[in-house]
Amino acid sequence: MAGVKAYELRTKSKEQLASQLVDLKKELAELKVQKLSRPSLPKIKTVRKSIACVLTVINEQQREAVRQLYKGKKYQPKDLRAKKTRALRRALTKFEASQVTEKQRKKQIAFPQRKYAIKA
């Protein structure tokens, strides 16, 4: 059961992944017992990598489910937000940048930008 592929795991259901994880952990425990009699056992490495792969796929699926849950909501958990630089996260949004004070708005209405046409 060693050497599983991530693309194959992504097609499986949650229950199938959980059962495969249990099987892999049992196999790893058996291999650890065998290691006492035979020190060099290369299969342990592949089983450990397979366990990591299964856990990674499970984690990806859980995060995607939570992403769908928070889609369209105003706030979402920090670990699901887009990873930007600190400065970009603190920058004004388009709406905040477009805000104008009442006084400035009145000035813009009273004295609009002049448009000039050049004679050719």
UniProtKB/Swiss-Prot annotation:
Its main location: cytoplasm. It is found in: Cytoplasm. The keyword Lipid metabolism does not apply. Keywords: Cytoplasm, Phosphoprotein, Ribonucleoprotein, Ribosomal protein. The keyword Cell cycle does not apply. GO terms for molecular function: mRNA binding; structural constituent of ribosome. Pfam families: Ribosomal_L29. SUPFAM superfamilies: Ribosomal protein L29 (L29p) (SSF46561). One of its GO terms (cellular component) is preribosome, large subunit precursor. One of its GO terms (biological process) is maturation of LSU-rRNA from tricistronic rRNA transcript (SSU-rRNA, 5.8S rRNA, LSU-rRNA). The modification Phosphoserine is found at S13, S50. Coiled coil: none annotated. Component of the ribosome, a large ribonucleoprotein complex responsible for the synthesis of proteins in the cell. The small ribosomal subunit (SSU) binds messenger RNAs (mRNAs) and translates the encoded message by selecting cognate aminoacyl-transfer RNA (tRNA) molecules. The large subunit (LSU) contains the ribosomal catalytic site termed the peptidyl transferase center (PTC), which catalyzes the formation of peptide bonds, thereby polymerizing the amino acids delivered by tRNAs into a polypeptide chain. There are 2 genes for uL29 in yeast. Component of the large ribosomal subunit (LSU). Mature yeast ribosomes consist of a small (40S) and a large (60S) subunit. The 40S small subunit contains 1 molecule of ribosomal RNA (18S rRNA) and 33 different proteins (encoded by 57 genes). The large 60S subunit contains 3 rRNA molecules (25S, 5.8S and 5S rRNA) and 46 different proteins (encoded by 81 genes). uL29 is associated with the polypeptide exit tunnel. Belongs to the universal ribosomal protein uL29 family. This is Large ribosomal subunit protein uL29A.
